[in-house]
Amino acid sequence: MMSSDQQGKCPVDEETKKLWLREHGNEAHPGATAPGNQLECSANPQDNDKTPEYHTTVDLSQSREVSTIPRTNSDRNWIYPSEKQFYEAMMKKNWDPNSDDMKVVVPLHNSINERVWNYIKSWEDKQGGEACGGIKLTNFKGDSKKLTPRAWFRSRILHLAKPFDRHDWQIDRCGKTVDYVIDFYSTDLNDANSQQQPLIYLDVRPKLNSFEGFRLRFWKSLGF
């Protein structure tokens, strides 16, 4: 089960949810090695100062939003792609995107990333990152086809819904690498109140691939 401090929920209308599922639900997305014109945030420190190269004439915003997420080995934050970059990255992957969808998908993508970061900061509170100015994000990737052990247990043993997406984020805590995993769930429309908007739930927790991951989860389970 997801504890209250592990899950974030974000109400979205059904059309927005469908767009998110279509654009995020079936492919792994590039991580920190992706160039600045790929789907996720810019990974190249120089990309903040460069004018992106565009290859289509589609009329979409070229404005980019600077995130609140600090970047490892940089004094700057990660920067989100513009609507046009997002669209062209999908075109490059042969996803046949609808340009009108970008005005919905891009803000949702950015907002959910910010929520993920806030939950990671909650896990990292008083863990030593304050000594060097705070934790930073090193890299990230998405793979909706790969179930986490918790998601597998929930779906196969408890017969609950599978997450529609999964992300893996790696953060730097004053030189120590800590891995986090995020499962994305949504309410079943058949169960949801017809008067309410569907919800996207974020199950954010440290990965159990290191002693630090086990330690963080153990102390959190004790209420620390």
Curated annotation (Swiss-Prot):
Gene Ontology MF annotations: holocytochrome-c synthase activity; metal ion binding
Top class in the EC scheme: lyase
Family in the record: Belongs to the cytochrome c-type heme lyase family.
Function of the molecule: Lyase that catalyzes the covalent linking of the heme group to the cytochrome C1 apoprotein to produce the mature functional cytochrome.
Record field: compositional bias (Basic and acidic residues): 11-27
InterPro entries given in the database record: Holocyt_c/c1_synthase
Phylogenetic classification of the source organism: Eukaryota, Fungi, Dikarya, Ascomycota, Saccharomycotina
Compartment list: Mitochondrion inner membrane
Stated name of the protein: Holocytochrome-c1 synthase
Spans traversing the lipid bilayer: none
Gene: CYT2
Region span, Disordered: 1-64
Source organism, top-level taxon: Eukaryota
Biased composition (Polar residues): 35-46
Any Gene Ontology CC annotation: mitochondrial intermembrane space
EC number: 4.4.1.17
Keywords: Heme, Iron, Lyase, Membrane, Metal-binding, Mitochondrion, Mitochondrion inner membrane
Signal peptide from the UniProt entry: none
Catalysed reaction equations from the record: holo-[cytochrome c] = apo-[cytochrome c] + heme b
